[in-house]
Amino acid sequence: MRTLWIVAVLLLGVEGSLVQFEMMIIKVAKRSGLFWYGAYGCYCGWGGQGRPQDATDRCCFVHDCCYGKATDCNPKTVSYTYSVKNGEIICEDDDPCKKQVCECDRVAAVCFRDNIPSYNNNYKRFPAENCREEPEPC
């Protein structure tokens, strides 16, 4: 219960896509994005640098690249509409920005689900100083 309260406090003031992304991860990967991926490897969490450490970290790298390609919108705050049908996420907006951000989040959530076996606790709260290699291009 205390953990749920902490997560609720952390989400206060956060709008749009980040909250929706968290809910999407929970629905698809059956785990909390904040808890499992909030500070993982070199790319999961705020910012990102260096090279992804494993397949899970690569999910975050690709997500960061996808957000970076979103045009004429702020991916972290835009709200979008999606549904879940037969366990699959369907992005429903016609607006190009909302659709693109939803697709970025959908691909990342599926990537997390598909790469649960690669998750390595050694990369949780991974020190940024270990992420100094030359980054690969998006």
Swiss-Prot record:
Primary residence: secreted
Organ and tissue specificity: Expressed by the venom gland.
Enzymatic class: hydrolase
Signal peptide: 1-16
Highest taxon of source: Eukaryota
UniProt catalytic activity: a 1,2-diacyl-sn-glycero-3-phosphocholine + H2O = a 1-acyl-sn-glycero-3-phosphocholine + a fatty acid + H(+)
Keyword Transmembrane helix: no
GO cellular component: extracellular region
Binding site for Ca(2+): 43, 45, 47, 64
Residues forming the catalytic site: 63, 105
GO molecular function: calcium ion binding; calcium-dependent phospholipase A2 activity; phospholipid binding; toxin activity
Gene Ontology biological-process entries: arachidonate secretion; lipid catabolic process; negative regulation of T cell proliferation; phospholipid metabolic process
Keywords on record: Calcium, Disulfide bond, Hemostasis impairing toxin, Hydrolase, Lipid degradation, Lipid metabolism, Metal-binding, Platelet aggregation inhibiting toxin, Secreted, Signal, Toxin
Enzyme Commission code: 3.1.1.4
Disulfide bridge partners, by residue number: 42-131, 44-60, 59-111, 65-138, 66-104, 73-97, 91-102
Record bears the keyword Metal-binding: yes
Cofactor requirements of the protein: Ca(2+)
Cell location: Secreted
Function in brief: Snake venom phospholipase A2 (PLA2) that shows very low inhibition of ADP-induced platelet aggregation in platelet-rich plasma of human, rabbit and guinea pig. In vivo, shows efficient edema-inducing activities in rat paws. PLA2 catalyzes the calcium-dependent hydrolysis of the 2-acyl groups in 3-sn-phosphoglycerides.
Family statement: Belongs to the phospholipase A2 family. Group II subfamily. D49 sub-subfamily.
Protein name per the record: Acidic phospholipase A2 Cvv-E6f
Organism: Crotalus viridis viridis (Prairie rattlesnake)
